[in-house]
């Protein structure tokens, strides 16, 4: 909401909010994944939600459209979050944001998304419209990319551009070893992948605020790219 209303940078707004909420590292990681996931897939989420919502998303009172996107993202992209939990948490968000009257709408729309997630509406016809929705990029940019690269290369570019970039960190061998650090980070809900060719380098995603991780606080790793 801060990004949409005030033009705030996602990283800064999320870090500030996580600092206020005092979440566990695991919950902060989940929160971060949801925030970035919703922003990266906004047009795709809008497309699916519009199929089950009787009102246009941009006509809903804020922050209802974002609550719907948050719920739909969890249902469609997060296997570890049960559908019923995503629905109930979204309904609760309506209440905590002073939109209790809309809780029935949110409940109904998200239940339909969950019921149909194996048979979702087809993407729009036409290469430009399809790619725009599938990868949540504006049509003007998709047109430009297709004219420069062709359909196949443009789609590959859009796919990569829409993936979250991992954070590269280096294990501090004076305080831990790679296996122990991997186990510790995964225990806190962080997605960890050892770098394919650089020893002691790990690629992290879904970290939330890095500074809340015990391993960061205790100096068991440093943020540094693989080339460093």
What function would you assign to each model-found segment?
Residues 1-216:
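Class I Rossmann-like S-adenosyl-L-methionine
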Residues 217-228:
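Conserved SAM-binding loop and adjacent beta-strand
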